[in-house]
Amino acid sequence: MPPANGKKGKKGGAAKAVRRIQYRPKSFKHSRFVKHAHFWSAAPEEDFDAILAEMQLADAKTAAKEATKKDAKGGKGKANGSAAATAAPEEAKQAWQAEIAAMKPIDEQFPDGKFPHGIDESPYYLKGKDGRVATDRESNEEKKALDISYEEVWQDYRRSAEAHRQVRKYVKSWIKPGMTMIEICERLETTSRRLIKEQGLEAGLAFPTGCSLNHCAAHYTPNAGDTTVLQYGDVCKIDYGIHVRGRLIDSAFTVHFDPKFDPLVEAVREATNAGIKESGIDVRLCDVGEIVEEVMTSHEVELDGKSYVVKPIRNLNGHSIAQYRIHAGKTVPIVKGGEQTKMEENEIYAIETFGSTGKGYVHDDMETSHYMKNFELADEKIPLRLQKSKGLLNLIDKNFATLAFCRRWIDRLGETKYLMALKDLCDKGIVDPYPPLCDVKGCYTAQWEHTILMRPTVKEVVSRGDDY
């Protein structure tokens, strides 16, 4: 899951990454805010938009009920096309729900609590370009003891990672053109909840399933009523997270069906692997970005008779990870000229790269679905006048805390008519919206991502699997 944009320095030097927590887009649908001295006040037209959205949702539900009634009145022996069309997807849903219910949770698969390791990439970890990385970490007794003291932490990450691997293997077995994006997300998330044995904030989903299509690079997941269908010619980025005690795995892959996109997808995968190879304790973040750009731009893709150099999306980055915090402050650029800040021992990173046939720069677009509580204000008591806002905030605190969430998940908890309350929380800065991030229309984007543990003795690519 990518962080917010980075900005160039005044002299065009090192790019300074901006934390996602500071990212505040332009409208509520694109999340606009009007700031006053001591509070956030909503623009009147945005109130109207939220009310209109509530009305449209209510109208859609009413229409669905009316259609159901008409189907019921079709009479005996009369085939009703609408009823038959509704029954088929429902039967299919019941079938995959039963299939998932039969799956064995990860902790039951490994009852001794020792979960599979990721891939230890020691040779790359121990060989810094200028000798800055110590060469005795694997054999140093002090480092071994320190590593062992963190074993419970590493096991939480490994349990999350094993769930991620099994979920994505299952997803790849059935995802295909013709499926709605809502069906894809619901089936993936149901599987994740089952395998990680969801239990409040103790274990569960770390952030909404991203399934961004084509020119949209990140932060798209369908809201209720979204009828978007996956097509043969789509390039879909599947980005989802799973956590145990807030120790989360952030890993992503790209799905496509038309082989003409193979060069684009492979270019980005190679760039991600190059970034992982370069990463390590005492490695500068800018060095990772430089190697990622070098590898990615060495690839070209031909689409419909036109050649494109694969461009890294310069205002998307990898990032550090902390407990219950998807973006912990450090950003890992995917272009050269980034920060001189170094990676440190015991840090966790999501190394992710995005490639594009467009401009290589994303902007806010489409309807917002992703939200996350402002981590900096998580413990502050900001006065709320609307009772609905207070109730929604309590629901967020109880179910998501500082983890990202989406509107579908609020719907799933039985909350209704909450858009005005959600907007109120956004206006006051308590919750931050994260709209879809898109390059120019008509272009295509791809993404690959892994989570790595900077253990004292070794660099462990904990989310690595046989697939990627």
Swiss-Prot record:
Q: What is its main location?
A: cytoplasm
Catalyzed chemical reaction(s): Release of N-terminal amino acids, preferentially methionine, from peptides and arylamides
Q: Where is this region: Disordered?
A: 63-87
Annotated EC: 3.4.11.18
Question: What is the documented disruption phenotype for this protein?
Answer: RNAi-mediated knockdown causes sterility due to a defect in germ cell proliferation and/or differentiation.
* GO-annotated molecular function: aminopeptidase activity; exopeptidase activity; initiator methionyl aminopeptidase activity; metal ion binding; metalloaminopeptidase activity; metalloexopeptidase activity
Task: Name the Gene Ontology biological process terms.
Answer: germ cell proliferation; proteolysis
- Cellular component aspect of the GO annotation: cytoplasm
Cofactor comment text: Binds 2 divalent metal cations per subunit. Has a high-affinity and a low affinity metal-binding site. The true nature of the physiological cofactor is under debate. The enzyme is active with cobalt, zinc, manganese or divalent iron ions. Most likely, methionine aminopeptidases function as mononuclear Fe(2+)-metalloproteases under physiological conditions, and the catalytically relevant metal-binding site has been assigned to the histidine-containing high-affinity site.
**UniProt cross-references to NCBIfam families, sorted A to Z:** met_pdase_II
Q: What name does this protein carry?
A: Methionine aminopeptidase 2
This chain's source organism reads Caenorhabditis elegans
